[in-house]
Amino acid sequence: MRFSFDRDAMIKEISIAQEIITNKSPVSILSNILLIAENNSLVIKATDSTVKFTTTVPVEIQEEGRTTIYCDKFMQILSQSPSGEIEFIQEDIKVTIKPAAKKVKFELKSQTSDKFPEIGTSENLPFFEIASKDFKEMIQHTIFAVSDDKNRYFMTGAYFLKKDEKLTMVATDGRRLSCVNKPAYEAGDFTPAIIPVKILSCILKNAPEEGNIQIAVVDKSIFVKFANHEFSSVLIDGQFPNYQKVIPEGLTQSIMVNKADLDAALKRTTIVVDKKVSRIIFKISSGVLKLISPESDSGAADEEIPCRYDGQDISMALNYTYVTDPLKVIESENVVFDFNVNEETGGEASITKAVIMRSEPAGDYIHVIMPMNY
């Protein structure tokens, strides 16, 4: 096998392959990428056995063939090579890589392609299209709420379904929940799916901002295509919780605060917060939100910022990361917390049941947060 390629075009694709590959052992075939040179293009395949990736790069082929090489070393060679043409030559198990712009050559050992796991074709699958921007926004607003508790494996991915002509993505770790709805476009019916975080992260990082992407959910797998890229993943097997029961209804009160003010105040007051607890107290009164970091081994802090609220004095304790994570992706100037007030013993008003955090005006996503005890 012998071909030449453009270094910059190749490095973009190999960097994506590296995201897929988790086994870094040079003796494991899963540490390799499969290269297939034919029809003046190079097909590149990578997998960790669960997530699979296929892409195509234009190359000039002198001799067709296929092989596998250690992805990590190939990426290091590309990273240290100058832009321009690079020659790739395979003879038996030896691969020679020669950048045209430098008097240097590298030699790698290859493994035969018949040892590489089969990555099947997605032809004839029932793909539907969705705006890439919409799907990426669905991921952005849910991925941080996915649980990392392996004992509750059915919550270690984002739930994706079609209902009432809408596409919905939901994630929860049991203490917070994020939900996004988008138009279903021309999507056909499919079985609701729990999508692993890894493929969602790859799509979020690599899908374009403009145009559409194609999605198919079939046979306990999801397939995603855009540009010259195709990703697929085995879905998480399990029963996702009934998320609709978690979303509170009939909330009668709200506080609105400037997003930038809240973000900056949280960054300051959480400097001394106990990171094992991550608790911040919100004390809300007419026109004023006071953020309090309770006294810890590091110290204490509080800060007042203006807000729009004209009800009784109330308070609630929240895990501050459950607030800062949505703040990173909410784009509106102001954010709103919707809630109901509970009267506790002693007459002090507090919020102890689920709170909805959202944009203002309301968008197609919500973030549900359970208050903490304090």
Predicted features along the sequence, with ranges:
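Structural preference for solvent-exposed beta-strand-turn elements
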Residues: M1-Y374
